[in-house]
């Protein structure tokens, strides 16, 4: 009599396994995300080519000094913004995951990249969601050279790797990982087990063949990559392509990168010919015209290895509600509440009866604390209905005691602002330039009261 297959219960969000079903995942605290999956015994690989890892067919112990320090040469994707996010180009043997909402432009960007790379190397584009005719129509509409790019419509990972062994490409795109499946996994495509095992299989194939594999992934409603968390641990680089549906600009950000900086940012513009690089991102995020308005300030972000000028807009208005509204777009809601408390305690401005709305222009998401001072001065400008000078740039972290703390790369931020024509800057005292910046008047402040005093004299 055949034994009944073993089962386990796996969380669809984080991949945690349990011996029985429960309503809430004790690992990630999500509700109703645990599903039953069948377990199969992992047999020894019948193909020795798939048994090695990182290019080695058999594992062996080495001393650290015996390992070659020669860096694997990268190759360019054809897009300098994408190369920047990847850390300087595509590394052979790397496994890259790129996610984004439907319509963000993931497939369009990768099709443009692959058509360009196919001129000088063997490139394979595997589509599992679209037919070959649909991909060909998109390439024709975008005016892309399509005579060299190899195409394959397949969802079986084993078959994809077998065909790739015959073609021997230098780069493979798999669109998308959620529709791929392995025959040995007893679950439907898109399940936790299938996504995890397919990604691991493709990653192992990339390492053993020294072929770069780019996998397309779906995202959840909150903007995180769908599938188990172990998916992000298995790959080398995780990218997220973001952009509002009604916006012509897209931002590509690295959330994990073993070959470069994390949180590196690349900016693209969506056109009729596909995605185009934006060489000067600061220009598109500064939307101010000739008319000076209150509640607007400019700060310098540090995204990965590049400085970026961003405009912050604030609107403070008397509230008709018992509980005034606090809305932050592009900024953390809790950070806004914290700064309002600091402004009341150490700045003497009471906004408890005011509605407060804050927005970062261009859809940029700001997570670093260097935006604190710029946000506070924008709030004060709106509250007093007094515009800030157009040639003023601001950055600095604000502490709970009202102190202004320095931020990393202060000199580079000031220099970037000067390049864009800004004449004045309010910065923390700890970021005081070691030498004078040409055509830039720098005001250094230690406390919030110092910043308010500078603001009154501008």
UniProtKB/Swiss-Prot annotation:
InterPro entries: AAA+_ATPase, DNA_repair_RadA, P-loop_NTPase, RecA_ATP-bd, Ribosomal_Su5_D2-typ_SF, Ribsml_uS5_D2-typ_fold_subgr, Rubredoxin_2. It is an enzyme of class 3 (hydrolase). This is DNA repair protein RadA. Has a putative N-terminal zinc-finger, a middle region with homology to RecA with ATPase motifs including the RadA KNRFG motif, while the C-terminus is homologous to Lon protease. ATP binds at residues 100-107. DNA-dependent ATPase involved in processing of recombination intermediates, plays a role in repairing DNA breaks. Stimulates the branch migration of RecA-mediated strand transfer reactions, allowing the 3' invading strand to extend heteroduplex DNA faster. Binds ssDNA in the presence of ADP but not other nucleotides, has ATPase activity that is stimulated by ssDNA and various branched DNA structures, but inhibited by SSB. Does not have RecA's homology-searching function. Belongs to the RecA family. RadA subfamily. The keyword DNA-binding applies. GO terms for molecular function: ATP binding; ATP hydrolysis activity; ATP-dependent DNA damage sensor activity; damaged DNA binding; zinc ion binding. The keyword DNA repair applies. A motif (RadA KNRFG motif) lies at residues 256-260. PANTHER family: DNA REPAIR PROTEIN RADA (PTHR32472), DNA REPAIR PROTEIN RADA-LIKE PROTEIN (PTHR32472:SF10). HAMAP family: RadA_bact (MF_01498). It holds the Pfam family Zn_ribbon_LapB. Its EC number is 3.6.4.-. One of its GO terms (biological process) is recombinational repair. A zinc finger (C4-type) spans 11-28. Keywords: ATP-binding, DNA damage, DNA repair, DNA-binding, Hydrolase, Metal-binding, Nucleotide-binding, Stress response, Zinc, Zinc-finger. Residues 355-458 are annotated as: Lon-protease-like.
